[in-house]
Amino acid sequence: MKSYLGKKIVIIGLGITGLSCVNFFYKRGIKTYIMDDSYSPEYLKYVPYDIPCHLGSLNVKWLINAKLIIISPGVSLYHPSLIIAKKLNIEIIGDIELFAREASRPIIAITGSNGKSTVTSMIGAIALNSGLSVGIGGNLGTPALDLLNEKSYQLYIIELSSFQLETTFNLKTIASSILNVTHDHMDRYPLGINQYRLIKLKIYKNAKVKIINLDDYMTWPVHKNKSVCIGFSSHKGKYCIKKHKKNNWMVVNNKFLLKCSEMKISGFHNYLNALVSLIFSDILKIPREISLNTLKNFSGLPHRFQIIHKKNNISWINDSKSTNVSSTIAALSSIKIKGNIHLLLGGDSKKANLLPLMKIIRNKKIKLYCFGKDAYLLSKISTDSFINDTLYHSMIKIKENLNHGDIVLLSPACSSLDQFKNFKERGEKFTKLAQKIG
């Protein structure tokens, strides 16, 4: 363990990640100082009584006298107080950097604009079914630092967001993948998509194997080194999806391994997620039979293209996790019906480019129901659109227009934070309303 004794350590943010950082040091007898710009952060009640806390703002005096600052993923490095600290050469890191310094077992890491939680969960399920003791977490579920508490793990499988990668410098993995890079979080990255991409690419540093998307050059490494690259694709290469007798198949080395329709999950984007998971399991030398059986029976994660209600030949799909344009496009591309798609869009678009969404909507029978902060902006994508204040009012409007064979899709292409606690709360609200209205 790297020595932190005698250093003034400041932790910014008291969400679940910040609390994991507090506990990491507290268990090692190391004093920290905590600050959060909220007066009542969610996890304050779990903080030991003898740890100094500053609430309602950032304490600049604490920051400029610190030797180490640990920030939660939601805290921007562009915060004026952190810019001052950086100029003073004070070290600023996140929880994943702490985890990377302490972890003594092999690590697999996954990032991407979309699909990373699904892939992380798929690989985790395969590894567990193979008999491995696995710690699964990071941006999904258990904070990475909390995984260190279980000493029996043989492998860590961690999902990483771009926010976490910003403050990660020494992560070493046996395999890492960037699933895709599309416009997202542009409100966080003032220099645009290339700045966002370069942060994602940090996951390849010190990776023994890089798993890249051959269809998305933005996932390709910019620096050559001795690590191995394995590609996956929607149509070409060693690992790909191919059509055979009108069916999609997972193919490896021209061998047709699994008919995609045999899997419980649906959607072409999920077939690619399964393909990436197979690559990781091959790297781990897990028997193919275990991998393929696990993928067949993997039922997906809540709020991700999840059919939550069916009645009168009308399907209601909860895709609340689609918080960006590319994810909504992937959902729409997976739907092929004769009826109408009633698409719920709404929330904070995060300054995203909406033109790609406009193109796909023009080519399908789609009615838009727009709500929340950017409802007016979203409604301009199509002439067949309705503006409502809330998700509830949008769904009441949908009920007036439904016919047999239609699909109602919540795939908002936006952050939920303008009206909901998170995407989960939004998805749960949709599910309850669908079961009531439908």
Swiss-Prot record:
InterPro entries: Mur-like_cat_sf, Mur_ligase_C, Mur_ligase_C_dom_sf, Mur_ligase_cen, MurD. GO terms for molecular function: ATP binding; UDP-N-acetylmuramoylalanine-D-glutamate ligase activity. It is found in: Cytoplasm. GO terms for biological process: cell division; cell wall organization; peptidoglycan biosynthetic process; regulation of cell shape. Its main location: cytoplasm. One of its GO terms (cellular component) is cytoplasm. It catalyses: UDP-N-acetyl-alpha-D-muramoyl-L-alanine + D-glutamate + ATP = UDP-N-acetyl-alpha-D-muramoyl-L-alanyl-D-glutamate + ADP + phosphate + H(+). This is UDP-N-acetylmuramoylalanine--D-glutamate ligase. It comes from Wigglesworthia glossinidia brevipalpis. The lineage of its organism: Bacteria, Pseudomonadati, Pseudomonadota, Gammaproteobacteria, Enterobacterales.
